[in-house]
Amino acid sequence: MSGSALFNTGNVWLNPASIAQNSSLTTSLFYSPSPFQLPQLSHFGLTTIKNFDRMNFAAGFTSFGFSLYRETVFSFTAATMFTESFGAGINVHANHLSIQSYGSATTTVVDLGTIISPIENFNIGFSLNNIGRSSFGADDDIPQIFITGFSYMVMEKTTIAVDIVHDVRYSTGYRAGIEFSPHEIIVIRAGTQSEQSQLYGGIGIKIFSFQIDYGIATHTELGLTNSIGITFSN
């Protein structure tokens, strides 16, 4: 489940502190072949996370678009737990934009994040994406985003997460989700966000060291988006 207050390796793009508690070699990939039923918007990502003593490091890659327009991001993340209840991390991205017939551009983007656990089963996360307001040349073509998140494990098998998201270009919005595990190998997820009134659903299945995730998003005007993810932990 996504959320800036969750210690979850899949959330490293939201909050670099999310990998601070990772203790194993973890590799994950996701693929959305046709967002909003448009193959030109295909999105792919791959991340590997490794623990070294008290530090966790991650290297990642994402690609969005098609041959005429493509955004590619190479990322490096470092995170650690300073205390049992406080973790922090940093992302450094190399963002590359290529537009056929117009050329290409590259810039560096830095994200900072923390996660605090003031009481058992309750986390608060803070992250600032694109702290230096980097761009490809036009103002705000790479957004600066402030996220404040909360997560609470209501019961042993149920977690609720809420993010308050402020993109400096727009009004403040929210994301909310719930994750329920009816069995040790199955996870069911649902969520919503204020932007574009989207609804989300998904399921994850754990098989030995692998977890396979499927997600679907609905948009009131643009239709469905399907995505799949695979995570390996050793």
Mark where each language-model region is:
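Subset of outer-membrane beta-barrel
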Residues: 1-234
